[in-house]
UniProtKB/Swiss-Prot annotation:
It comes from Chlamydia caviae (strain ATCC VR-813 / DSM 19441 / 03DC25 / GPIC) (Chlamydophila caviae). Signal peptide: none annotated. It comes from the Bacteria. It catalyses: an N-acyl-L-alpha-aminoacyl-tRNA + H2O = an N-acyl-L-amino acid + a tRNA + H(+). This is Peptidyl-tRNA hydrolase.
Amino acid sequence: MTMLIVAIGNPGRQYTWTRHNIGFLCADKLLQGFPEAQFKEARKLFSDIAKVESPQGSMVFIKPRTYVNLSGKAVSAVKEYYGIPIDRILVLADDVNHPFGNVRLRQNAGGGGHKGIKSITQSLGSNDYWQLRLGIGRPQREDIELSDFVLGQFTEEEQIGIQSLFIEASALFSQWCSGTQTA
């Protein structure tokens, strides 16, 4: 059965190395194990899409081109196009409610204030999908707005720590693919 892996982030080079795009970066890292996989634009599905075959089955990775807050439009379109059941959807998203480097895998989880997650839940009419939440922490100073923080570039320290985050995310992703995860 086909699996849908949704990376949340914003399109455009100016956002590539921002905290809000850690989902896009994580998808790129996960796809390194599939050298044949290349993201290609699928305008009618509002996404860049990469398809791979694995021992666990077919996988469709998407990077919505709708910007974070409207991610649900792309997820809903791709889900319908490929006929993917909601419990075979995994969303890779940044999480300000957990310290940088903390990674959690959950099903039926709330959005924690994440507007992209909220958009996906609204578009699908359910939160019965899986989330791989990638901790980015919160601003260290009170004078920094949360929106500026998530759209900000990674610090040098975060750039070093992101590799450990990706290793943990990859392990949880493998568990999810094989069905050995716990909710």
